């Protein structure tokens, strides 16, 4: 079967590899669509990062580069392994793409996403969504309704990142949120917030991203910091108080500074983006306003609720898909476009079976 294989920085190859074995306790999936994630781009431009370098196998998967890529994917079950009796051939599914140790508890209230040596399918080994087929442990396979188109279903994984950020924020219906940055995660986070009855203000410089936020209906207000004083505008929109929650989705220090100043006293500020460099923060403002600054990473028992929001029609993922491509065009039409034209491309999805 065809698969996209990461060898090293700038070296991703489309190769023929053996089909996976559907072992006991696993589910065989024909991949329908797989999204290209910002993490994939970082691996391509700067890696290996999450991907274990050649000769240095991951302690759980036992694999190192080359590995099959892709962790945002949907598909159709073609086989189930021995012991799997609650999923049937032909069901539509998405995958929560974790690689964790078998003895880590994954029930409600656990923090399995923070466990030692955690990694992701499509990065740390165990196959990937940028291939025709994959076999995944039953625990990480989530059935979805046939009402959700499989191309949109590929966005449930990044949507779950947004949902986990929402959970971490403690936001509730009627609150006002400020989202710094309208990239893919910022937009999907905003979609979750709107679905939960929260008023959303987005701050963004890019015209294309502002347009996408407007077209998708995920923002009540969109502020361009090159045109207005964001903090002053937020105060006007909140009767002088500031926002209840804020989300940093850019890895840009000026945005972080703006969010701190736009928060009301006792607000929660969630850092969503992955920073590759140190940040500074006005600690005096944090202290004097008793702000609660929180991190968030990936997701943890978020997929069920995220799937429900989409199935019930509270979130429409179609507006966020900006291009559909074949696996053979992964680098030339996928990675290269996202690297050089990332403002206009929200989510490019790949069909490995075309």
From Swiss-Prot:
Activity's thermal dependence: Optimum temperature is at least 50 degrees Celsius for the oxidation reaction and around 45 degrees Celsius for the reduction of (3R/3S)-acetoin.
Keyword entries, A-Z: Metal-binding, NAD, Oxidoreductase, Zinc
EC number(s) on file: 1.1.1.4
The record's free-text note on cofactor binding: Binds 1 Zn(2+) per subunit.
SMART domains to which the protein is assigned, alphabetical: PKS_ER (SM00829)
Single GO MF annotation: zinc ion binding
Enzyme's top EC category: oxidoreductase
Residue sites binding Zn(2+) per the record: 37, 71, 157
pH note: Optimum pH is 9.5-11.5 for the oxidation of either (R,R)-butane-2,3-diol or meso-butane-2,3-diol and around 6.5 for the reduction of (3R/3S)-acetoin.
Highest taxon above the source species: Bacteria
Domain Enoyl reductase (ER): 10-350
PROSITE patterns in the record: ADH_ZINC
UniProt key word Metal-binding: yes
Chemical reaction(s) catalysed: (R,R)-butane-2,3-diol + NAD(+) = (R)-acetoin + NADH + H(+); (S)-acetoin + NAD(+) = diacetyl + NADH + H(+)
Cofactor(s) needed by this chain: Zn(2+)
InterPro entries xrefs: ADH-like_C (IPR013149), ADH-like_N (IPR013154), ADH_Zn_CS (IPR002328), GroES-like_sf (IPR011032), NAD(P)-bd_dom_sf (IPR036291), PKS_ER (IPR020843)
The protein's role, per its UniProt record: NAD-dependent butanediol dehydrogenase which catalyzes the oxidation of (R,R)-butane-2,3-diol to (3R)-acetoin and of meso-butane-2,3-diol to (3S)-acetoin. Preferentially oxidizes (R,R)-butane-2,3-diol, with a catalytic efficiency approximately fourfold higher than with meso-butane-2,3-diol. Shows a very low activity with (S,S)-butane-2,3-diol. Can also catalyze the reduction of (3R/3S)-acetoin and diacetyl in the presence of NADH.
Family: Belongs to the zinc-containing alcohol dehydrogenase family.
Record-given protein name: (R,R)-butanediol dehydrogenase
Source species: Neisseria gonorrhoeae (strain ATCC 700825 / FA 1090)
């Amino acid at each position: 079967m065809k698969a996209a294989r990461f060898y090293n920085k700038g070296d991703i190859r489309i190769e023929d590899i053996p089909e996976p074995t559907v072992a006991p306790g696993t589910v065989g999936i024909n991949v329908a669509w797989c999204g290209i994630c910002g993490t994939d781009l970082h691996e391509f431009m700067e890696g290996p990062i999450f991907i274990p370098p050649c000769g240095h196998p991951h302690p759980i998967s036992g694999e190192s580069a080359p590995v099959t890529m892709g962790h945002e994917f949907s598909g159709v079950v073609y086989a189930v392994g021995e012991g799997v009796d609650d999923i049937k051939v032909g069901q539509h599914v998405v995958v929560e793409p974790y690689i964790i140790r078998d003895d880590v508890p994954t029930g409600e209230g656990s923090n399995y996403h923070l466990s030692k040596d955690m990694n992701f399918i499509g990065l740390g080994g165990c196959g990937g969504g940028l291939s025709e087929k994959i076999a995944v442990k039953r625990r990480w396979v989530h059935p979805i309704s046939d009402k959700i188109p499989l191309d949109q279903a590929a966005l449930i994984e990044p949507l779950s990142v947004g949902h986990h950020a929402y959970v971490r924020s403690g936001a509730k219906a009627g609150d006002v949120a400020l989202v710094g940055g309208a990239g893919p995660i910022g937009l999907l986070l905003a979609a979750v917030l709107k679905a939960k009855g929260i008023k959303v203000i987005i701050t963004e410089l890019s015209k294309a991203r502002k347009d996408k936020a407007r077209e998708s209906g995920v923002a009540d207000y969109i502020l361009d910091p090159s045109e207005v004083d964001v903090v002053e505008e937020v105060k006007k929109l909140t009767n002088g108080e500031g926002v209840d929650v804020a989300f940093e989705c850019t890895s840009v220090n000026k945005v972080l500074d703006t969010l701190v100043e736009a928060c009301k006293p006792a607000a929660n500020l969630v850092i969503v983006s992955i920073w590759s460099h140190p940040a500074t923060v006005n600690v005096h403002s944090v202290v004097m306003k008793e702000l609660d600054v929180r991190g968030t990473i990936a997701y943890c028992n978020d997929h069920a609720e995220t799937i429900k929001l989409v199935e019930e029609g509270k979130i429409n993922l179609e507006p966020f898909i900006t291009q559909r491509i074949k696996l053979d065009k992964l680098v030339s039409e996928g990675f290269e476009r996202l690297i050089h034209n990332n403002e206009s491309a929200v989510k490019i999805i790949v069909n490995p079976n075309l």
